[in-house]
Amino acid sequence: MMLTKHEADQWFAEHSLPDIKIFPNKDIEQHLRYALSQVNTHDLFLEFGVRDRKTFNIIKEYSNVVHGFDSWTGMPWPWQLTRLVEPAKTGPHLAAKTIPKSDDTQIFWSGLFEDTLPKFLKEYNQPISFLHIDSNYYKSATQVLTALNDYITNDTVIVIGQCHAFEQADLKKWGNVWNHGLLACKNWGRNIKFFSRNHFLQVAGKIT
């Protein structure tokens, strides 16, 4: 089910712009801000995987309202290199210390994506300007892309975290499991073109 390093490298190259912008470090904020600067519409801004709101607060600087999705209880499955198997056992992996409160500028959806997405779509069925998926699991990333498919347009900027180990050292440390974001995009079936990436796991692209 997982992509090998060679398969992931090849698929990513085939779906990247020739002049893809590469940030030569592992700084998530710098790359995230660049991706946000490429947004040219003012519709929905969404983040899946909020946790401590570090990236969420950055996204808020670019939109009047941002929707955040998370369980805030930790990983729904054990965080391990065999995570794509996704056993039923649960645990408080990476749980947030506090659950944030919603207001006029931030709306939080607490629970598993499969439970909160249907509720969200009943209230908000409009195009998506910016989508940040930082879900840690292939299953979760696939749920997001599938549920929001009709609202992802050519103007939607998509940022996916934990997407691909570009360095052999990272691959040795984490294994092919870090290709889960890339695999979700591949199996999604839409023609995505990546326009930027940082040096570790985070990529950004648009549908063409």
Language model region names:
Residues 17-30:
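Conserved SAM-binding loop and adjacent beta-strand
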